[in-house]
């Protein structure tokens, strides 16, 4: 072994120390001390695998394994910091129960719905899958097959899945788990601005004078961003932090003003603030007159339940997202009932506190950053709440300038970059296009080299609807990738599990671990994780980041995109397209979906020589497939306000915020001088709308679908904790994180506990008409609910708390409300 001078000195020092201790140090031990090619750790960059913050980490690999990670000091997002989960990223891929081979339910050597999971080859797995898909497509058509994806998919994985489903199988029945976390944010952006994703960026943290958290525990869910708020608050005494929530949590520890409100009453609070702005002559008339229109939303729209549900039948305008033009005077009249007294009565927040909050929005000299996560999004009126907060910023002109920013925080690493931008929702296409728009379908068909009429015009089944259709036998072949919906989704017992175990259905789950969802499937496919593949994520501030594959995958695992693309080889075009479509493209006869979708002269145009040596997918397919998928996808957004840089550029930087025009990223959208798409002389240009004007939309307070009653007398709120991410598939396999928080607890007010004869640590039964769970009571600790409400996190697979949640959704976004349902609690004898 060749040794450097530094290594020689270190080795001699070690030998001297050993001699003093009376120890003889063998020559073979020197490589424990000396640096060499064999012992060196190789470092490369990658975005974190967890939340939507988009921290960059340095990944240390040695002997084909990830052995260490650290915060990337060159990253503008996290500036070298990680949260506790990020510091243990090196361990997420090496759980003892990592799946390494396909598993098929079999009995007597054949597939059987009630059989035992048995290892099979990939060929066998795909043979069975293809047989089921072809039979379903032949007998029941494209609407009988579906896919449930993820905001954790890489950009390329989501894009490949969209192409296979919407162009190949001609089914729009593809939806991401981002439906459960970001759908209301999407619809809110589209209604108000005509284009998706935040206009601000993380630079706003260093400019704002007031932060308002509307249902977001950033201290635990976005801790790295919370450090930036903390630094701003502690470094600038005039800065104020406001936290609104239905229970006390760690973000309140920094708050200057905390507001505990009754569930659903945030609607009343936001309307009061708008009324306060008007009554106190704080409207920025120059901005409002030049850049906004006033609209009235249709009300009494139901709760996204099944059509035969009594609440849905009762709604006068079920599922309607219609709006009508109104004048400012009509808007003023619509918010006038929301006096401080009325808002206090509805919300439980004192009048003086409400006025304190309203003054910060009304003060023209106070830059306000509004932030929200699941507290606002997982809400049966989540879209309305988005609009109501945008109203406050539009009325005052506090938008799209440094420190003035309504900002939706994402929970998954690529809920923006993949679910939203790629368009993996049942109604969307890339770059904010939708399947219902014939012009948009024509654009997609042109980019994809498909005959006119390939993409269906009717939106597919959204996430909650997919569960219902599986249960009803309408949806029969279903592929779940990169999510654990059997644990994460609502109403498990009544709507989801029956569909998975319906004997008419064939369920495939692609995952790295045997999750609750995988255990309910018929076929489980082992999946590559994080830096076992090359990929790209898009974070909450529109920052696209890419990474190289850095280690080989475990066992026979493959990336989600490899699985999708390889599966496409099993289908001839004649198997899936009708004759009238084939007649428009006779050149495709006899070709596979792989030939048409992925070997199309675009995806395969970048040679293998451009890829790194360690790139399993590229070597398998024979070309630089990640670059090909990315560049074809990027064609949708370039020149249309979603411009991405060339793929190779992203490997050289710590991400870029789109639109990227002439090599320059965009920090603040819609603002002249910052956004290249804002017209000269406009000041602000909300170009997502045809006339460049944003909408101020009036929406009232409406009660939730269920309220506590004599039998079910407590509110239940579900959510997350710092140490675990979502359902804990990764974090619960990290020993340090598991030991820190091994179990989900029921956080409860001590007086509610005493009234039921309960003490801290007692095991209780939480129940309602949909199910029951056993959990231990916690009357202290980080989360402190008010009387009448309990909080239980959903990371614990042994406590499937979401079985208690009603599958009510926002009728406009189809996003489930996980934050409020009635339950009762009894002590386990």
Swiss-Prot record:
Reaction catalysed by this enzyme: 2 Fe(II)-[cytochrome] + nitrate + 2 H(+) = 2 Fe(III)-[cytochrome] + nitrite + H2O
InterPro entries: Asp_de-COase-like_dom_sf, CT_Nitrate-R-NapA-like, MoPterin_dinucl-bd_dom, Mopterin_OxRdtase, Mopterin_OxRdtase_4Fe-4S_dom, MopterinOxRdtase_cofactor_BS, Periplasm_NO3_reductase_lsu, Prok_molybdopt-oxidoreductase
Binding site for Mo-bis(molybdopterin guanine dinucleotide): 85, 152, 177, 181, 214-221, 245-249, 264-266, 374, 378, 484, 510-511, 533, 560, 718-727, 802, 819
SUPFAM superfamilies: ADC-like, Formate dehydrogenase/DMSO reductase, domains 1-3
Listed name of the protein: Periplasmic nitrate reductase
Family that this chain belongs to: Belongs to the prokaryotic molybdopterin-containing oxidoreductase family. NasA/NapA/NarB subfamily.
Database matches in HAMAP family: Nitrate_reduct_NapA (MF_01630)
Gene source species: Vibrio cholerae serotype O1 (strain ATCC 39315 / El Tor Inaba N16961)
Domain 4Fe-4S Mo/W bis-MGD-type: 41-97
GO MF term list: 4 iron, 4 sulfur cluster binding; electron transfer activity; iron ion binding; molybdenum ion binding; molybdopterin cofactor binding; nitrate reductase (cytochrome) activity; nitrate reductase activity
């Amino acid at each position: 072994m060749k040794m450097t001078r530094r290594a020689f000195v270190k080795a001699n020092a070690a030998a001297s120390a050993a001699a003093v201790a009376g120890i003889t140090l063998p020559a073979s031990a020197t490589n424990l001390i000396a640096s060499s090619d064999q012992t060196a750790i190789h470092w490369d960059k990658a975005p974190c695998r967890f939340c939507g913050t988009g921290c960059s980490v340095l990944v240390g690999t040695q002997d084909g394994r990830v052995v260490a990670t650290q915060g990337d000091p060159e990253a503008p997002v996290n500036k070298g910091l990680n949260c506790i989960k990020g510091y243990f990223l090196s361990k997420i891929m090496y759980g003892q129960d990592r799946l390494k081979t396909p598993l098929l339910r079999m009995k007597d050597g054949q597939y059987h719905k009630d059989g035992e999971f048995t290892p099979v080859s990939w060929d066998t797995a795909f043979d069975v899958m293809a047989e089921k898909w072809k039979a379903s497509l032949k007998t029941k058509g494209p609407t009988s097959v579906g896919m449930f994806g993820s905001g954790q998919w890489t950009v390329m994985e989501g894009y490949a899945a969209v192409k296979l489903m919407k162009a190949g199988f001609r089914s729009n029945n593809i939806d991401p788990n981002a439906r459960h976390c970001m759908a209301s944010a999407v619809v809110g952006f589209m209604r108000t601005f005509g284009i998706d994703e935040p206009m601000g960026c993380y630079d706003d943290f260093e400019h704002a004078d007031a932060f308002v958290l509307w249902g977001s525990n950033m201290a635990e869910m976005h801790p790295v961003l919370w450090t930036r708020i903390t630094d701003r608050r502690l470094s600038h005494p005039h800065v104020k932090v406001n936290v609104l929530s239905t229970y006390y949590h760690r973000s309140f520890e920094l708050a200057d003003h905390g507001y505990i409100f009754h569930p659903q009453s945030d609607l009343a609070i936001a309307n009061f603030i708008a009324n306060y702005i008007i009554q106190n002559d704080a409207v920025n008339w120059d901005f409002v007159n030049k850049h906004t229109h006033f609209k009235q939303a249709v009300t009494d729209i139901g709760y996204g339940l099944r059509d035969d549900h009594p609440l849905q039948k009762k709604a006068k305008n079920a599922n309607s997202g219609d709006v009508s033009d109104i004048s400012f005077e009509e808007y003023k009249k619509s918010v006038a009932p929301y006096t401080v007294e009325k808002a206090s009565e509805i919300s439980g927040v004192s009048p003086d506190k409400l006025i304190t909050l309203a003054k910060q929005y009304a003060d023209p000299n106070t830059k306000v950053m509004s932030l929200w996560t699941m507290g606002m999004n997982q809400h049966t009126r989540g879209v309305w709440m988005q609009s109501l907060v945008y109203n406050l910023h539009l009325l005052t002109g506090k938008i799209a300038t440094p420190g003035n920013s309504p900002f939706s925080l994402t929970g998954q690493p690529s809920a923006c970059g993949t679910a939203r931008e790629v368009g993996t929702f049942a109604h969307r296409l890339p770059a904010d296009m939708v399947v219902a728009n014939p012009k948009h379908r024509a654009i997609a068909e042109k980019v994809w080299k498909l005959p006119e009429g390939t993409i269906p015009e009717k939106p597919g089944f959204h996430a909650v609807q997919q569960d219902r259709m599986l249960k009803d036998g309408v949806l029969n072949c279903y592929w779940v990738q990169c999510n654990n919906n059997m644990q994460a989704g609502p109403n498990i017992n009544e709507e989801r599990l029956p569909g998975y175990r319906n004997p008419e259905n064939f369920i495939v789950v692609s995952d790295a671990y045997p999750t609750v969802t995988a255990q309910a499937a018929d076929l489980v496919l082992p999946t590559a994780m994080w830096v076992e593949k090359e990929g790209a994520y898009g974070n909450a501030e529109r920052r696209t980041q890419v990474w190289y594959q850095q280690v080989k995958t475990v066992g026979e695992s493959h990336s989600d995109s490899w699985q999708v693309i390889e599966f496409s080889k099993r289908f001839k075009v004649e198997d899936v397209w009708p004759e009238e479509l084939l007649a428009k493209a006779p050149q495709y006869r006899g070709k596979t979906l792989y030939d048409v979708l992925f070997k199309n002269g675009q995806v395969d145009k970048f040679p293998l020589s451009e890829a790194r040596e360690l790139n399993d997918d590229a070597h398998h397919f024979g070309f630089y497939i990640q670059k090909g998928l990315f560049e074809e996808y990027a064609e949708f957004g370039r020149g249309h306000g979603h411009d991405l840089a060339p793929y190779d550029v992203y490997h050289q930087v710590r991400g870029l915020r789109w639109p990227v025009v002439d090599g320059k990223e965009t920090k603040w959208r819609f603002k002249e001088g910052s956004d290249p798409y804002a017209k000269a002389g406009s000041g602000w240009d909300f170009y997502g709308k045809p006339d460049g004007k944003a909408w101020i939309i009036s929406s009232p307070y409406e009660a939730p679908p269920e309220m506590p009653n004599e039998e079910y007398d407590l509110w239940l709120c579900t959510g997350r904790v710092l140490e675990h991410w979502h359902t804990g598939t990764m974090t619960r396999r990290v020993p340090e994180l598991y030991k820190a928080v091994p179990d989900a607890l029921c956080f409860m007010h001590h007086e509610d506990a005493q009234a039921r004869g309960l003490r801290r640590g007692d095991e209780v039964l939480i129940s309602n008409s949909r199910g029951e769970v056993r959990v231990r009571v916690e009357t202290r600790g980080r989360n402190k609910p008010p009387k009448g409400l309990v909080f239980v996190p959903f990371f614990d697979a042994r406590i499937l708390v979401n079985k208690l949640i009603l599958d009510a959704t926002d009728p406009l976004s189809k996003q489930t409300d996980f934050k409020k349902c009635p339950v009762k609690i009894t002590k386990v004898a």
